[in-house]
Amino acid sequence: MGKRGFAGLKGADMAGLKEEDSELLARIDAWFEAHRQNIIEDIKRMVRIPSISKPTEGDAIEKEGPFGTGCRQAMDEMLSIAREHGFFTENGEYYVGTIGLEKKNYDNTIGFWNHLDVVPVGEGWTRPPFEPYINDGFLIGRGVQDNKGPAVGMIYLMQCIRELGIGMKHELCLFVGCDEERGMEDIAYYTSKYETPAISLIADSGFPVCYGEKGIVEGQLLSNDSLKKPVQSVWGGSASNMIPDRAYARLDYSEKLLNELESLNEKRKAEGGTEVAVRVQDEACIEVEACGTSRHSAFPDGSVNAIHELAVFLGQADGLGVENTAVFATLAGIASEYYGRTEGIDFQDEVSGHTTCAATVLSTENGKMCVNLNIRYAITQDSEELLRRLEAFAGENGLTWRLERDSKPNYFPKEHPAVEYLTRLYNEWQGLDTEAFVMGGGTYARMLPRAFAYGIGGMPKNDEDREREARLFKKGSGGAHEPDEGLNLRMYFEAMKFYTLAVAGLDKLELSSFVMGKPI
């Protein structure tokens, strides 16, 4: 519990808050504790649905929705939960659902935005990822943190405000989308056809306030020449925004090559490197598997990129031939670090810090090596110059650069009254002196007018939290986008209670002051 935490305490020390805020927070605390089990069960209902966004086309859209059956089911279930709590719901063609009042005045509305899609599960789970369970105070399952737990919490936030009779001069509305992790086509479509609120809070970040997000460039580096025998294929990674924890190669079998790979593996282990699995699949195939430690690509520190581990290993195997080892040496350089130094795009600014660049998905495309780059570039960096440098790097290294998207940075003025109020209230509550921040992660804020990301992550951990995490989760697991994704229930309920207080206070500001900032 943080200095000004209150979860599970009656009459907790809230000396940093004004008396009226402390009194309201105590009422909110009691309400959430009374609904605690129902909230957990509703999160479980959502987590049981494997809602990985998979775009559909043509006739399949009517049957499966625009992002596949899983996302369609998740939208149906979320809107059903909301109706059970007395809210009016609308389904925006399975792109975005809305939860709130039947008659809406968006010019006078504070909107909350969450997503119901999740990243692919990857490997390394202790138990099935879509069978949520509680272990030592953590709710575990894909999407509990990112972003189904917060999404369900927003329904209860609105219900709490309604049932406690907290007078609000602005309406509240929850918006839930289905394609945040893959490309945000849900929001692009929705905003082209439907109205948006006067201000939007995206509960997919941390406290106190995220007032800016780096730009995102995604694309692929494709080898100009095909991989030569004995290489059949290479692959690894499951999502463009995840550092991969597994990468593979399939090679033509020969006893000589097998002996060389096993010898390299022994040398690697003797030098303290991680072991690479070398397996004979049949008389025609050797499979090589390299392991790493996954993290979100926007926050790569602490990860180990399995693509790099595989490329380094294969680049040492003379039996693969000079042309192949040259390709793998280039790939090893690309995946060796996370700040774009290899590609010549390294940059940092005072507002947003370092640009990051991660190799996240490896594949074989028509016999050629293909690696996906997920780049989060600093707010003041010129993306056109960045793209020119990527083109130059590719040309100098026997590669072709293929741009997939360039999502421009989002910047909301740090001096804005809403940002200042929410930051100050958080610091009063926690007894801290933190500042609003810019992050590399991408949220719906970059796609919406008058929007910024706010909560519910980043709550201070106490010693017990850290001890439980150490017992439950091995390195590279427990976080969003990681195996055994876990939601610390103590911190979750503490955050939701505070979020409710913050919304009640935000309501006192004039919406006419909410003017969207422009990218620098």
Residue ranges of each PLM-predicted region?
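Acidic/His- and Gly-rich active-site-bordering loop/insert found
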Residues: 11-140, 164-168, 463
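Predominant activation on well-ordered alpha-helical scaffold segments within soluble catalytic domains
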Residues: 44, 79, 152-159, 188, ...
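A generic structural motif
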Residues: 97-99, 249, 284-291, 370-373, ...
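Active-site metal-coordination/substrate-binding segment of hydrolases
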Residues: 107-176, 182, 194, 471-494
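Acidic/histidine-rich catalytic neighborhood of metal-dependent amide-processing enzymes
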Residues: 147-226, 262, 339-350, 514-520
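Acidic-enriched catalytic cores of C-N bond-cleaving enzymes acting on peptides and small amides
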Residues: 211-222, 226-235, 240-293, 297-360, ...
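An extended, acidic, His-containing surface patch that forms the Zn2+-binding/catalytic region
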Residues: 294, 298-366, 379-385, 400-520
